[in-house]
Amino acid sequence: MAQAPTRTRKKVKKTVSDGIAHIYATFNNTIVTITDRQGNTLSWATSGGSGFRGSRKSTPFAAQVAAERAGTAAQEYGLKNLEVLVRGPGPGRESAVRALNNAGFKILNISDITPIPHNGCRPPKKRRV
């Protein structure tokens, strides 16, 4: 018996008007993730994934390129407004926020959510160069 042709449905892209940009800036890399209000990931990009390797990964320019790539991918969902959450002490913090602003997003507020220990784990020893 011949099988009936299965119809493939075209996946409908959801439209989101406002979302959250999570910027995780470490000393070695910068990760930019753009989510909707519920926390579902719409797009993401990293400095390392944007073509920067080694010490160039931890530069503000690499963070700017990563934020631009995540922003252009998120604009396909119709994203207009962003709430920015910045975490970590890295050099790409401000440049990533500036790149999202220049990409055409209206930034509603910027929050620093860097975890600060209440005297928890012992920190790494100081570098001697």
Swiss-Prot record:
Say which domain of life the source belongs to.
Answer: Bacteria
Q: Which keywords does this Swiss-Prot/TrEMBL entry list?
A: Ribonucleoprotein, Ribosomal protein, RNA-binding, rRNA-binding
Q: What GO molecular-function term can you cite, just one? A: rRNA binding
Return the InterPro entries for the record. Answer: Ribosomal_uS11 (IPR001971), Ribosomal_uS11_bac-type (IPR019981), Ribosomal_uS11_CS (IPR018102), Ribosomal_uS11_sf (IPR036967)
Pfam families in the record: Ribosomal_S11
Q: Name one GO cellular component term.
A: ribonucleoprotein complex
The answer to keyword Transport applying to this record is no
The regions listed as transmembrane in this protein's record are none
From the record, give the cysteines joined by S-S bonds. Answer: none
Q: Which GO terms describe its biological process?
A: translation
**Function recorded in the entry:** Located on the platform of the 30S subunit, it bridges several disparate RNA helices of the 16S rRNA. Forms part of the Shine-Dalgarno cleft in the 70S ribosome.
Q: Quaternary form? A: Part of the 30S ribosomal subunit. Interacts with proteins S7 and S18. Binds to IF-3.
Q: Entry's NCBIfam families?
A: PRK05309.1, uS11_bact
Protein family membership: Belongs to the universal ribosomal protein uS11 family.
- Its recorded name reads Small ribosomal subunit protein uS11
List the source organism. Thioalkalivibrio sulfidiphilus (strain HL-EbGR7)
